[in-house]
Amino acid sequence: VVGASGGPFNVHTMMFLDSLVKLGYRGRLYPVSSREEVSGLKAYRNLKEIPGTVDHVISLIPAAATLDLARDCVVKGVKSLQLFTAGFAETGEAEGVELQRELVNIARGGGVRLIGPNCMGIYCPASGMSYCPDFPPEAGEVAFISQSGSYTYLLVRMAAARGIRFSKVVSYGNGADVNEIELLDYLSGDAETEIICAYIEGTRDGPQLLRALSRAARAKPVIVIKKGCTPAGTRGASSHTGALAGDDSVWEGAIKQAGALRVDDVEEMVDMLVTFRFLPLPSGRRAAVLGVGGGASVRASDHCEAGGLILPPVPAAVRARLKQFVPLAGSMLGNPVDVLAERYADAWAPLVQTLDDWDEPDMLIWQISPEIEPLREEIVRQYMIDMRRRMMQVFCTARKPKAVVVHAVESGPGLESLEALRQMCRELGVAFYPSLYRAARAIGRYLDFGRSARAAPHSPS
C-alpha cells in the first residue's frame, strides 16, 4: 500500500491497509511510507526496497507521482496496480487526460494491469481483499462492478442487511485499462458468481459493451443501474469518471436488447437481489397477502396492483374454512386477509395452512407492521419478538413461494422488533422487503424477467 501513513485517524490507511488486516488477507502486506512502521507492519521507503515479489499495489499518492510508481511496478514485476489516486482524465483538463494516457502506456508496456484510476478497487471476501473494515467477511454469490466507489459502499452495506453476500466487488473508476467490458466477460464465466450487478455512468465503446452485456446475460442474471441520464447527469458523469454517458433512451433499449434488467437505483437493485436469491420463481402473479390493520390492508391492495401483482378474491369455501378459527371481530376475510388471528398463535398455523392449500394464489406475502403494535417493552419482547419467531417458523412451512414485508420503524420499541424480524428472515433465508410496494415491484419484475429469459435468445453475440 503505497502512501500508507500512521496515526489512529488516517482514513485512507484504515480503508486500504487496516481493512486487509481485518478481513484476514492471506498474503504478505507491505506499507510503503516514510515511517518505519504502519499499523503494526514494517514499512518500506519505496517499492524497490521490498524483498521478494509483489503481486498487487494500491496507490494512495498524488497523481503527479504515479508515473514513477508505475515504472517501479514494471521493474518489480507487479501484476496489477490499483489507483485510489484521482486527478486524471475525470478532471476534463488536458493535463489530467495526458497523465492518464502516459500511465496506461507505461503499465501496458511493462505488463502491469491498471484498476482505476480514481477508484476504490477490489472487495473479494474469499481472498481477504477489502477497502472497508465493516464489509462482511463471508463470501456470497453476487458480483458488483461500479464506476462509482460510493455506490459500492451503498450496495454492499444495504444488501448485507438483507442477507446478501458478495463474491467480488470492483470499483474501477475511470476504467483506463480494466473496464466494464472486460469485467463483465470475466464475471460471466466466474463459477463463484451467480448474479452480476453493474453501476454504469457511461462507456467509451457502446457496441462492445452491448456485446459483453449480452454474453453475460446469457450466462446469468445481470442487473444494471445506468446513471447520467439527464443533461445535468451527463455532465456529472463526465466530471466524475470521465465517462461518455450517452442518450438515455438508447441505453434503455440496449440494456433490454442485451437481456439485462435495468433498475433505477441501489434500493431497487437490493430488492431485485433479494428476490433472485431467496424467492423461488412463482408460477404466476396472483398473491395472497396476510396482514394486520384495515388501513394497511387497503394500502396493500393498491401497492400490489401498482407493482404488477394480482390479489384474487377469497372464495366462499375458503372463507368458510377461515371462519372456523379466525375471530370475525377485528378481521377482514378478503384478500389481503387482515386477521386478528395474527395475534393468536393457535389460529396462525391453520390460517397459513388454509391459504397455502387455496389453489388460486401463486405466492404468499406476510405483511408485518411493527409501527402499529403495542409499545410496552415487555410486550415487545414477549409478543413482537418471541411469538413472531414461532409464527415465522410456521409461515416458512408453506409450500408456495413466500415473502415477508417488515415495515420500517423510525422510533420507539418497535425498532428492536424490526431488527429481530430482519434477523429471523436472514437466518431462515426468506425474502423480505421494507414495503409492500417494493416487494410487489420486485416480484413483478422478477416474473417479467423470468418469462423474457425463457422466451428468446439475446443478441448480439
For the regions a language model picked out, list residue spans one by one.
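Catalytic-core regions of core metabolic enzymes
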Residues: 1-461
